[in-house]
Amino acid sequence: MTGKVYLVGAGPGDSKLITMRAVELIQKADVVLYDRLVSKKIVSMIPKTAKKVYVGRSVGDDTSHQNGTNDLMVEYAKSTKHVVRLKGGDPIIFGRGGEEAEFLKSFNVKYEIVPGITSGIGSATYAGIPLTHRKYASSVVFVTGHEDPEKNEEIVKWKKLAKSVDTIVIMMGLSRLGIISK
């Protein structure tokens, strides 16, 4: 295989928070596969010479959608040099970047993971809320509020977590707020 896939974090949505490395890779891309959490302003950075492929997934979509995205990454890596898989936030903080990397590796596709600012940090910082503070919070944890529905049981033990960590950042938890807050 001659191509390489870059799993790139686009940051929390503000185009000024995307990394210089991400911009560089977007500008060199032959193909960009992007999801629904990537802002329109960042999508507009994709050069006209690159093929843009929307692979956005919505809440409730089955896993076949992700399988299709995985297949596209391999397919494009076989036929082009630079494939960018552009993901909102950071690709490996609840972004399936780890799963995508495993898939690429299983097909011997070269890949690189490029970090992005996760919304859990970016939104708190913009709001002026310190996730850690020497006087008040010595620990922080990022936890999903929406675990894989195919698991037999919930792994997150909310009551135990609430007693053991100073700051809890819950990602994708709005629809399960009633369960989480008990």
Residue ranges of each PLM-predicted region?
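Class I S-adenosyl-L-methionine
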Residues: 1-10, 15, 20-117, 122
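Beta-strand/loop-alpha-helix module characteristic of Rossmann-like adenine-cofactor folds
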Residues: 2-5, 110-112, 118-182
